[in-house]
Amino acid sequence: MKPPPRRRAAPARYLGEVTGPATWSAREKRQLVRLLQARQGQPEPDATELARELRGRSEAEIRVFLQQLKGRVAREAIQKVHPGGLQGPRRREAQPPAPIEVWTDLAEKITGPLEEALAVAFSQVLTIAATEPVTLLHSKPPKPTQARGKPLLLSAPGGQEDPAPEIPSSAPAAPSSAPRTPDPAPEKPSESSAGPSTEEDFAVDFEKIYKYLSSVSRSGRSPELSAAESAVVLDLLMSLPEELPLLPCTALVEHMTETYLRLTAPQPIPAGGSLGPAAEGDGAGSKAPEETPPATEKAEHSELKSPWQAAGICPLNPFLVPLELLGRAATPAR
């Protein structure tokens, strides 16, 4: 039987105003300074050790506060060397903001205080991607999975693909993985001079890579990547300039331009919206006391309404970019 219809509601983290972490008291700051002074010989303070001695503060809060201290020290050092800024006070005021700064400021105004909720949602997306069967099959060596389908084979170390294992594609996953076990055998004599540790360095676990990106997006403790996994992450970053021109840039530019003009256009003032509180305050004596509770309920409802709810957009996609504009543009067939 068909289940009864269920009304989908927004997550609880999107409903209310997300409050930031509690401010640091003077006692906590003095205690943190003493802990940092005791670790002057260390190149980088460990937030885990500091959280054990500094009660009431988590690793994430300590890590964020340390980043704020580093940024403050860097700004003070720049101000001492360049009192008027890197290009002087007048030049700095006249310099227009960079495009990324304009979009970042606009996104912050739209999402409001939901930055932490957006970081959590983005981290959850990467966590789900880490458990995808295709992700497990792309790892080297491939991880066992119950997903049915033809696993995608990785290229050999010499850059040549092995066409032989592709023939028994209709066979189940277990027999197809069995012939791959003797493949690393001929590589051992060539790697014996480098030592057994190189085998672990060349292992690529995409599940660990996704977990690493998920933890980094939330400034959390990330797993340690191998040399090959670090090379994969570096290659992803270096390939961004090559991948951006492959997007449908013309349609993407048109959409972003229309979105910017729509979001920055002056909004018309509603007829009764702005005069509602003032009219209620002026005519409080003429109105009956029975009409005041609905007005207070509306005021409370408007106060609980987030900026993204008032704008009618999803905070995970504040600029309403269609998904087809985020993929590679279709190349014309030759």
Curated annotation (Swiss-Prot):
GO terms for biological process: snRNA transcription; transcription by RNA polymerase II; transcription by RNA polymerase III. One of its GO terms (molecular function) is RNA polymerase II general transcription initiation factor activity. It comes from the Eukaryota. Residues 167-180 have a biased composition (Low complexity). GO terms for cellular component: cytosol; nuclear body; nucleoplasm; nucleus. Keywords: Nucleus, Transcription, Transcription regulation. It is found in: Nucleus. Signal peptide: none annotated. The keyword Electron transport does not apply. Pfam families: SNAPC2 (PF11035). InterPro entries: SNAPC2 (IPR021281). Residues 137-200, 271-306 are annotated as: Disordered. Part of the SNAPc complex required for the transcription of both RNA polymerase II and III small-nuclear RNA genes. Binds to the proximal sequence element (PSE), a non-TATA-box basal promoter element common to these 2 types of genes. Recruits TBP and BRF2 to the U6 snRNA TATA box. Part of the SNAPc complex composed of 5 subunits: SNAPC1, SNAPC2, SNAPC3, SNAPC4 and SNAPC5. SNAPC2 interacts with TBP and SNAPC4. This is snRNA-activating protein complex subunit 2. It comes from Homo sapiens (Human). The gene is SNAPC2.
